[in-house]
Amino acid sequence: MLGRPFLLGAAAVLLGLGCGGDIGQAGGDGSGPEASNAGSGAPGEPGEGPGGGEPGEGLPEADPYSVTFECEPDADPSVAPLARLTVLQYERTLDALFASVPGAMDAARGALDQLPIDGEQEESFADMDGRISQRHIDGFINVADAVAAHVMADPARLSALAGDCANGGSLDRACFDAFIADFGRLAHRRPLSDAEIARYGELAGGVDAAEAYRGVIFSMLIAPPMLYHLELGGTEVDGRSELLDLSPHELASRLSYHLWQAPPDAELRATADDGSLMSESVFEAQVQRLYDDPRALETVVRFFGEWYRIDIFGGFATTPAFETFATGANADQALYDAAAEEIEALVAYHVEQGNYRDLFESDLNFARSQALADLYGVAPWDGTSDPGALPDGERAGLLTRAAMLISSNHGTNPFKRGAFIQRDILCTPVEPPPNLPPGALTPPPFDPMATTRERFEAKVESPTCAGCHATFTPFGMALEAYDGLGRFRTEEQLIDDDGNLLGSVPVDTQVSASFPEGMQELSGPVELSQALAESERANECFARHYFRYSFRRVEQPGDECVLSGLLERVGPTGSLRDALRQVALDPAFKRRLWR
């Protein structure tokens, strides 16, 4: 293990970050081995540093939905907070740095698994989690120490990382300085200055060659340029010190992490090195190249999975009622996993060759497992041929697929289903009134004489509840065409708590639903999906969510042009692929505003 004072100094680096001067100096950028704590943590839990609390903390608070889609091309971009690498980005960056060293990621795995999970305290996208807590600091230090120790434990590993010259009996200064420059360029995602190389080189003072290399590896892995998206080296726009065009290396890094969640590859780095990335044609070619890579599609699919909460599932109930309800359905974790994979396949297919409306209206079958195909009443899709269609009139788009409909027990909850559409698909807040009476949020009890719709409607028929529920509950009632496993039905089974099947009753999915564009009469889920596909508010909501996912924060004044560009491409004639690529092509992507 490296010395305790060295580790404490590293922790101080993470807790405070200045913005000027040489590394290691008071008020410096914190990237050197002697950096000290330049600031105190933000209010919050003990040990939280800058970035603790909600994403964008310190920026003016405003209603996020007040930011319009009216683009003024000459307007400044919005102010963006300093962001650390997400845990996914951090792992992929480590993997790229130590690709030549066998077992490096395995050596780091224990410490990596102790890092806080992004999004564990965030209601929206995981990547909007900007916290730096004591757990993060401890984790980063432990990862750096484990990886550095792993490299130094075998001369062959050090040779793979730094060259054979690193294993001489004494320190080869030229070899050492070259390693600092080469490894630092990758870890910091830009070339190091001469001053930085000299300051890292001071780690060789008073120690043997092995400890010098180990110290550099450790120090660079806990430096802010490694752990944060630092953008400090741009050029002033029209003489304005607060508005910067990103430097070529900053732009390369922003683009790569945006599309790949990973650091720039060799080709992208080369365009930054020679400055050609600043050319519009070269930049657009690199955007296209990165977007054509499977890693970009993975990033897009992950967006929809998080937006639609696909990864949130606590397992199926083990009650007698559920056992009766699920007879013959193979209701297990494998069924849910297959349903989640179907969503990924549907999204990937229509991102490549479709538009946003297709995600609401598609009746194509992407069920690859036999159990899920049986639930839909179709043959499994083979994963390569053109997908066939689901039974006519039963399903349309994402909202009607099993992963969006499966509940943990035998019943459905129209309130939850409807609130999701209102809140997440139409971007209209669903706020419970103050002073709710006891039991207000508890589902109504089973009634052998009533359907789920009748029971839930009776619960909120009082004037206190009816007005609010009228805005979102009809969406959930239209989805009563599907049971708690996502099976299409025209009749609802009435099952008591002991698992006795008492009979069945017709399902009513006719609703009068309130959209921002006006009231609509809908006969069921297919018409609901079609109405959402045609809703301008739903299109705007998609643009807002994809902005938040991409920029890791809520939109602010100055983001109107990015939002407008996204919205422009989600209409009936638009391309979902172009919409998702638009963020990188917007002029604001190349600039940073300081306040």
Positions of predicted regions on the chain:
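Axial heme c-ligation environment in periplasmic c-type cytochrome domains
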Residues: F551-V554
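GGW-centered surface loops in extracellular recognition modules
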Residues: A80-A83
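Ser/Thr-rich, Pro/Gly/Ala-heavy low-complexity intrinsically disordered linkers and tails
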Residues: M1-L2, L7-E70
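Active-site substrate-binding loop specific to GH73 endo-beta-N-acetylglucosaminidase modules
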Residues: L59-A75, V87, D95-R548, D559-R595
